[in-house]
A protein has these predicted regions:
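Glycine-rich, Lys/Arg-enriched anion-binding loops that position phosphate/diphosphate groups
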Residues: 162-171, 176-259
């Protein structure tokens, strides 16, 4: 069994939960959502996909992104009237109310704060998935799953992935919030680090995880680079009405870290448009849009907007990847949609 997930904090926590409950997982594949959307990922029968768009060859699928909602009913074999196959046009309609959010042998989907929350519900919903039945290994895994340590990890994952953070969380990150900032899915050479995190988040309390030398060093670097990152953001950002426009194309050695720092610098604006180079495809530009987490007055459905441009996401945050030659056209169109 192989786990296919995304290298962000939510994806790593999904990995911790799935490997806790599925001892048959023997390999991992970390990919970005766009590669899955573009059909560039070979998925095979038996694969578990978590926190990524759907692929019809998988066995279990766990997700919570609104733009992926139509494919839950396809995964269950309940097809919409508008046709077969994967959704090719923007469609953020949620599954019918009577459609179950958890199905044994299929996985789970709902618009939850995190994909990890959906995975957790799959393995803890009474009668749906696992009962020990005298099996000591399964009982130990269930005990861990129901522990206060794991419940706290899930609560923190919800908070991080849904951006339910305070200014103090952003300006003085600690604990799992700080650890989440050390994960950069655009660096495949970091895969051993992601694997280490999966194991520690599954097996160890927060204090032990923070005490690991590698994690400790990465966390300290995030804190040390915060001022450098702030200066770069201020130099590369323009305030255009209600929109924070940050253009990081051409910036070398951008510090890792705090994606929410921008909102502490421009608290009056309600949405951001960030443009950057796609580090994995040289002919591609990365575009992301997100509500200001401290000023959520925008009315834009960001996920639906990004889907129009070949991407996806949630109601309040999303991204897309576009060819460089077409980037300015997409940027103009997106800006016009989000400005007030």
């Amino acid at each position: 069994m192989r786990l296919v997930t995304r290298a962000d904090f939510d994806g790593v926590v999904c990995g911790a939960l799935v490997t806790l409950m599925e001892d048959a997982v023997d390999s991992f594949l970390f990919v970005e959502p766009k590669f899955m959307q573009d059909g560039m990922v070979e998925v095979r029968r038996g694969d578990v996909i978590a926190n990524l768009p759907y692929h019809p060859s998988c066995t279990l699928w766990f997700d919570h992104h609104i733009t992926n909602a139509p494919n839950w009913e396809r995964h269950l074999g309940v097809l919409r009237a508008e046709g077969r196959g994967l959704s090719a046009q923007p469609n953020t309609q949620q599954p019918k109310p009577e459609t179950p959010t958890i199905v044994e042998g299929k996985g789970g989907f709902r618009i939850a704060p995190s994909a990890a929350r959906v995975v957790y519900e799959y393995y803890t919903t009474p009668g749906e998935r696992r009962e020990a039945g005298g099996n000591r290994q399964i009982q130990d895994a269930l005990d861990t799953l129901h522990s206060e340590r794991m419940k706290f990890l899930l609560d923190e994952t919800d908070k991080i992935d849904a951006a339910l953070l305070t200014q103090e969380d952003v300006l003085n990150p600690q604990g799992y919030v700080l650890i989440s900032m050390t994960i950069d899915g655009k660096r495949p050479e970091d895969e051993p680090y992601w694997m280490k995190l999966i194991e520690l988040l599954r097996e160890a309390p927060l204090e032990q995880t923070l005490g690991d030398p590698d994690i400790k060093n990465r966390c300290q670097k995030i804190l040390d680079d915060q001022e450098k990152l702030k200066k770069i953001l201020l130099a590369r950002t323009a305030l255009r009405g209600n929109v924070i426009v940050t253009d990081l194309r051409g910036v070398k050695d951008l510090p890792d870290g705090n994606r929410f720092l921008l909102y502490t610098l421009f608290p009056g604006s309600n949405i951001s448009l960030k443009i950057g180079d796609d580090s994995q495809r040289g002919n591609t530009t990365a575009i992301s849009v997100g509500y200001n987490i401290f000023n959520t007055t925008s009315k834009v459905n960001v996920g639906a907007l990004m889907e129009k441009h070949g991407g996806g996401g949630h109601h309040v945050v999303g991204s897309c990847r576009v060819p460089k030659r077409d980037a300015e056209k997409h940027i103009r169109e997106i800006f016009e949609e989000i400005r007030e």
